[in-house]
Design a protein with these regions (language model features):
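Helix-enriched interaction subdomains in cytosolic or periplasmic regions
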Residues: 1-5
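Conserved nucleotide-binding/hydrolysis micro-motifs of P-loop NTPases
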Residues: 39-40, 94-96, 138-141, 197-198, ...
Length: 229
């Protein structure tokens, strides 16, 4: 049986885009962790495994502009959502963490879900509790900062001698007029290219193969939320 009516269409009341709910998955657990994209999805699956959280269902909600219609589908159409007790959303902060936070908050308000006062904190009503996580996580003062999951992954291996070689390579590339539009992605995949048996792997596959240190201090805020789900 399909999880949603196959011909049901949702139109986002902000961007006007049509969204057709997927019938390829169903809500199977009471704790949902929504991840932005394939890499974050796989990364968080292995993080949950590392933290021994087998009662969490990790779901890829797509790109950042797809969260709003995805939540609308999840809350209003998907079977078994009434049984969900915890919902956590994880995405990149990108170049403007305030804008990223505002976007997720707006999506939660649109479907009348509780809104946490700050990222990495829970908010709840009588039915469900929610939390927001932004990669690469908070700074030393506890404030969320700009960045991506790639930055977080590399932070977990910040003591690796190979990173000095990677940085030298990227500096050389920039001196030769190579415009690195996504420096953290360039750094991460250059790092993987220099690792035996890991060249060409995606971030999520590297997580499965234990390249990233998921018990590193930089993972502590994420670990705390996942364990408290």
């Amino acid at each position: 049986m399909s999880a949603t009516p196959p011909n049901k269409k949702i139109t986002c009341n902000v961007c006007g885009a049509d969204f057709y709910p997927s019938d390829k998955w169903q809500i199977k657990k009471e704790k949902l962790l929504l991840a932005e994209g394939t890499d974050a999805h796989r990364f968080l699956i292995y993080a949950c495994g590392t933290y021994q959280k087998s009662d969490v269902q990790v779901i890829d909600f797509g790109g950042i502009n797809e969260l709003r219609p995805f939540l609308k589908n999840l809350v209003e159409i998907m079977e078994n959502f009434s049984k969900v007790k915890t919902l956590v959303i994880a995405r990149d902060a990108e170049t403007n963490v305030k804008s990223a936070i505002d976007s997720v908050v707006s999506a939660l308000k649109n479907v009348n879900l509780p809104v946490p006062q700050e990222p990495f904190q829970f908010s709840s009503n009588n039915h469900i509790k929610t939390a927001l996580m932004f990669f690469p996580g908070p700074d030393q003062e506890g404030k969320c900062r700009n960045g991506t999951l790639e930055e977080l992954c590399l932070t977990t291996v910040d003591d690796a001698p190979l990173l000095k070689c990677v940085d030298a390579l990227l500096q050389c590339a920039q001196k030769n007029n190579e415009d690195l539009k996504h420096p953290w992605k360039s750094r991460l995949y250059a790092y993987l290219a220099g690792k035996d048996d890991h060249a060409g792997k995606k971030l999520g596959q590297a997580a499965k193969d234990k390249v990233w240190k998921l018990n590193h201090a930089a993972m502590a805020p994420f670990k705390k939320i996942i364990q408290e789900m």
